[in-house]
Design a protein with these regions (language model features):
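Conserved DEDDh/DEDDy metal-dependent 3′-5′ exonuclease domain
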Residues: 51, 105-107, 131, 303-305, ...
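C-terminal polymerase-core module
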Residues: 492-499, 503, 507-554, 722-770, ...
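Function-dense linear segments that define catalytic or interfacial modules
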Residues: 398-427, 434-436, 590-675
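Domain-level signal for Mg2+-assisted phosphodiester chemistry and nucleotide/NA-binding surfaces
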Residues: 1-99, 732, 746, 759
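Conserved "right-hand" nucleotidyltransferase catalytic core of DNA-directed polymerases
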Residues: 234-355, 436-610, 629, 639, ...
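Conserved catalytic core of nucleic-acid polymerases
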Residues: 473, 585-586, 590-593, 668-801, ...
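Conserved beta-strand -> loop -> alpha-helix junction used to position metal-binding or nucleic-acid-contacting
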Residues: 5-10, 128-131, 135-163, 389-406, ...
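Extended two-metal-dependent nuclease catalytic cores across DNA- and RNA-processing enzymes
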Residues: 22-24, 73-253
């Protein structure tokens, strides 16, 4: 028999501190639960146990506290974020069939010791999973400790058996008690002997065997005079430490074989709880997929009617709820295959209508129909492919879910119905979520209203989905031949840089793509500074190389990497996704970024490089079709203008209103000098501070950005905050308000939950403060450009123009316009982008036209 015993408090603690804070949409912490269950799955795979016990401490004092008042007196209490998760974790373990073990007056360590001793008596194998090295004293021929440790900055489970203990410490496992009695244990406040550390304690135990043996040989010349003095002075404390540090093996718990066999638990309740905690990924990993969650209390005992499955009427009318049943994947040999394809369905009253594409087309642009849907984007695509616009769609649940919880990694109906506890109106075996759609949509609409996000939803996010679908359908024309020729040029540059690298290293076989070879060359062979060791050798990440850019070899390495990325990601990447029409049809992602920003993929056009001359040339291959031009409108310093408006800082506002160079004006204000005396260096510093202040950068980060000492950067920051007190006041108030309510908002009401602000961990809390400073500004900028996109798109349609909005990248919009409409398109872009909001500082755009993106930008 193989028994796995988990030190519950220790592993939960490891999981909590090892994973960033995770919360549900209603603010419940889940990171410790998620991490613990992942560790449990790994342990089950590694040990293949027949039985599993999870030991937990109780809050009550133990016999050790009664023996010594100072025992664990220096320990901080459990963080509140972790304490909230512990009862839920125990409930979940019980539902999964795992038995938890506690004993009043005893510690989890003693439970581990007692179960290990029982296994040894039966000659059964016992595995102890813990992060506490105290348990190493329990290692024996039948007991192995699986020690959760951090090795070279990474979490790792280290297997400790008798041989491993002997190799690491040079003693037997039980002798570790003797070591602890001498050196003490600061974490448990076990005193030990003054002046005796681990190295000395190990030497003494290796030579004299036990604590008693040390005192029997107290006059041995191996023991130095000062050590002898301390040993004699602290003899009673050493004996006490021995008793405190010894894990007991007689805790009053059940140790009979079979006691900890994994039971049935309550799988339906486990599914319900995992869904409620929004830890959906673990449901299949625990073999729970296909198990219906326990019904909410209000549904318990209620008989629900089975829905009718019917074909869509030839002349549909009224309101339908439309959603899709996800595809079911499976294995065919080693290949992933689709066992059941995605399928759409509509719900009206208690009837479910399976939908073919032809049915969808009849619904999507039907004056007699209104559609409340989940995930409008693919439906708009289907409508537009059929020559329509999807005008029947009036609401999208996926967009609502995103606004209500932007931190979620995905949005699925089954998960949302669980987290919202949506009541079922009927049952439907073929479409399990269909009966809960109405209540889910109703609850989401109510929450959108309660959060004050109706305007954000109705004026920006919902209409934007149609705009993005049209942009994807239209696509961007590219010069395929030009991209191919650019690739040839790029590869030539790569070969030349590689040749220089080989000359500088003196090795034609040197591979700059090998982190190992590069690290050894830079730090072992050449002896360059700033080397950092990782588990795999020398670090050669971008930050390390940037700090060494002044060395010719490193400059060439950075150049080589940049050219490689250009070639693989953009040249080769773009060529792969050019459609038959010669256009790239990138997919715009509306529900991914927590700040509200858009992203794109297939390909990602948001990161087209512009900072290098060679990289910016790529824009030349995004072109207008014959007879047309690209009209590019780019917001000028939109985030700084929003900062000026949102903080109410008069100097910053006046600088913009006067048309001044904001960075030069800032430098003049900070240093108390006329603008004409501001040097380029001072302007650069002011620019870095202007943007850095929004991102919560401190003196250290700023120093790296502008190439000054940390002390100088700190002085810059202090001067800035003194010169712009309203900016400082706004930042402080934003953080305070966010801590009070748990979120920050943009000027349009978009919320971003920040559970990090409640963390007891300084680094996590500081990260939350940076996000609190930045999100209202960056998020408002995202909202503004989205609103501008909606207004530009609608106006182009309303004025029946051929011009089409085809692309957005960061703060710019691009329209492909016939030459005869170019001037009008530019006017519309400027008017709608600058006029979509009225702030204390007017928004400003730079608008240009050209045959290609580079020329237009």
């Amino acid at each position: 028999m193989r028994l796995l015993v988990i030190d519950g408090n220790s592993i939960a603690n490891r999981a909590f501190f090892g994973i960033k804070l995770l919360t549900t949409k209603d603010g419940r912490y889940t990171n410790a639960i998620y991490g613990f269950l992942n560790i449990l799955l790994s342990l089950l795979k590694e040990c293949e146990p027949d039985e599993v016990a999870v030991a937990f401490d109780l809050k009550a004092p133990t016999f050790r506290h009664k023996m010594y008042d100072g025992y664990k007196a220096t320990r901080h209490g459990m963080p509140e974020e972790l304490a909230q998760q512990m009862p839920v974790l125990k409930e979940l373990l019980a539902d999964l069939g795992y038995r938890t073990v506690t004993a009043e007056g005893w510690e989890a360590d003693d439970i581990l010791g007692t179960l290990a001793a029982a296994c040894a008596a039966r000659k059964d194998d016992c595995f102890l999973a813990t992060g506490d090295r105290d348990s190493l004293q329990l290692v024996s021929d039948t007991t192995t400790v699986l020690l959760a440790a951090t090795v070279m900055g990474r979490s790792k489970t280290v297997t400790m058996d008798v041989d491993a203990i002997q190799e690491k410490y040079g003693i037997q496992p039980r002798q570790l008690i003797e070591v602890k009695s001498l050196m003490g244990d600061a974490s448990d406040n076990i005193p030990g002997v003054k002046g005796i550390g681990e190295k000395t304690a190990l030497t003494l135990v290796q030579n004299f065997g036990t604590l008693e043996g040390v005192y029997e040989h107290i006059d041995d010349k191996l023991i130095k005079p000062k050590q002898r003095e301390h040993l004699l002075e602290c003899r009673e404390m050493a004996q006490l430490s021995h008793t405190l540090g010894t894990i007991r093996t007689d805790a009053p718990i059940d140790t009979a074989e079979g006691t900890y066999a994994v039971g049935e638990g309550n799988k339906a309740e486990a599914v319900r709880l995992l869904q409620e905690l929004e830890i959906h990924s673990l449901i299949p990993r625990f073999g729970l997929d296909g198990i219906a969650p326990a019904a909410p209390e209000e549904e318990d005992g209620i008989e629900l009617a089975e829905a009718e499955l019917e074909a869509l009427p030839l002349t549909p009318s009224g309101t339908y709820l439309v959603a899709s049943r996800p595809a079911v994947m499976g294995k065919q040999g080693t290949r992933n295959v689709v066992l059941q394809p995605e399928s759409w369905y509509a719900v009206q009253d208690c009837t479910v209508y399976p939908l073919e594409d032809a049915d969808l087309v009849r619904l999507l642009d039907n004056a007699d129909v209104t559609l409340e849907v989940f995930n409008a984007a693919p439906l708009y695509a289907k409508a537009m492919a059929a020559g329509g616009w999807g005008s029947s769609i009036v609401w999208d649940g996926k967009l609502a879910a995103y606004l209500l919880d932007a931190s979620a990694s995905k949005y699925q109906i089954s998960e949302l119905t669980a987290s919202y506890r949506a009541a079922a109106a009927f049952t439907c075996a073929d479409y399990p979520d269909a009966g809960r759609l109405a209540d889910l949509f109703c609850k989401m609409k109510a929450e959108i209203t309660a959060c004050g996000e109706d305007s954000l939803y109705n004026e920006i996010e919902f209409p934007l989905a149609q705009v993005l679908a049209d942009m994807t359908r239209t696509g961007v024309l590219v010069d395929k031949d030009g991209i191919e020729q650019f690739g040839v040029k790029l590869r030539t540059e790569l070969e030349q840089v590689l040749g220089r690298i080989h000359m500088e290293t003196g090795s034609a076989s040197f591979n700059p793509n090998s982190p190992k070879q590069l690290g050894e060359m830079l730090f072992d062979t050449m002896g360059l500074p700033h080397g950092k060791k990782t588990q795999r050798g020398w670090s050669t990440d971008a930050e390390t190389l940037e700090s060494l850019r002044d060395y010719p070899l490193v400059e060439d390495i950075l150049q080589y990497r940049a050219y490689q990325k250009l070639n693989s990601t953009y040249v080769e990447g773009l060529l792969k996704v050019i459609g038959e029409d010669g256009r790239i049809h990138s997919t715009f992602n509306q529900t991914e970024a927590r700040t509200g920003r858009l992203s794109s993929d297939n390909p990602n056009l948001q990161n087209i490089p512009i900072r290098t001359e060679l990289g910016s040339q790529l824009r030349a291959y995004f072109i207008a079709k014959p007879g047309c031009v690209l009209v590019d409108a780019d917001y000028s310093q939109i985030e700084l203008r929003i900062l000026a408006h949102i903080t109410g800082d008069e100097h910053m506002q006046q600088a913009f209103l006067n048309g001044e160079d904001i960075h030069r004006s800032t430098a003049a204000k900070i240093y108390g000098i006329p603008q004409e005396e501001v040097t380029s260096r001072l302007r650069s510093s002011a620019k870095a501070i202007n943007f850095g202040i929004m991102y919560g950068k401190g003196a250290y980060s700023l120093a790296k950005d502008i190439g000054v000492t940390v002390k100088e950067a700190d002085a810059f920051l202090k001067n800035y905050l003194a010169a712009f007190p309203k900016v400082s006041g706004y930042m402080d108030k934003t953080i305070a308000d966010a801590k009070a309510c748990g979120y920050v908002s943009t000027l349009f009401g978009r919320r971003r939950a920040l559970p990090e602000l409640a963390s007891s961990n300084f680094n996590v809390r500081s990260s939350g403060e940076r996000m609190a400073r930045n999100t209202p500004i960056q998020g408002t900028a995202a909202d503004v450009i989205k609103l501008a996109m909606v207004r530009v798109w609608k106006r182009l349609r309303n004025e029946k123009m051929e011009s089409r909005l085809i692309l957005t990248v960061n703060d710019e919009l691009i329209v492909e316009a016939p030459q005869t409409e170019a001037e009008k398109a530019a006017q519309i872009l400027r008017e709608e982008m600058e006029g979509c909001v009225q702030y204390a500082v007017p928004l400003s755009t730079d608008v240009h036209a050209g045959k290609n993106w580079l020329e237009a930008h």
